[in-house]
Amino acid sequence: MDRYLLTATLRRDGSSRFSENNRWGLFPSAALAWTISNEPFMKATENVLSKLKLRLGYGVTGQQEIGDYQYITSYSFSTNPNTTYLGTTLLKPNGYSPDLKWEQTTTYNVAIDFGFLNNRINGSIEYYQKHTKDLLNTISAAAGTNFINLITANVGKMKNKGVEANVNAIAIQSKDFTWEVGYNITWNDSKITKLTTTFNPDYQGIDAGTNQKHQVGEMPGTFYLYQQVYDENGKPIQNAFVDRNNDGQI
């Protein structure tokens, strides 16, 4: 019976959303599995422990979810009625980022698959880490360096880690009827580790919606709100907020 399994792939993907110098990305992956329950020394436990497998995985994926033609200079007709010249609509230059390239996520995972009583009870536990670099991000462009003040660029890093577990059981199994129950649980922690090309402790992050920001050291889309002040009975005091840096301003 199979005891050792190895799978490896190598992808080379191209996207017309990047220039010729950065168009192609190389994305490897590999998976290794050891079916421990098929080892001769596990023979004595096969009536109870019907499956036990250790899995290891590694892979790199690429993301290119941005608009088209952002790496080249282009012009478009202005739709602003104030940007006309003698009744003629003007052409305006659009912002561009010639050095755009693939955003890459490297994933590592280790997992255990198990089964008891001829797999009537089975499940798995998996731990993973994901490291993303060259985040495709919207950042401010310095005055005079581009045609617009916000451009798309590869800036930033992010880390994810988590645990996923599931267990399934065949409660009833007959010729005409099978009842299977299952339970799963997931824990994930995401943290942005970099958002600028150089370290800048004063950088305030990127707006991600109403009262939300992408900020280094926090989860993506973290809500930034005023800290409420409560009275001695635990009830919120209207329009009273904590002055966190004691500068006399909220």
Model regions: which residues?
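Calcium-binding motifs, dominated by EF-hand helix-loop-helix domains
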Residues: 240-244
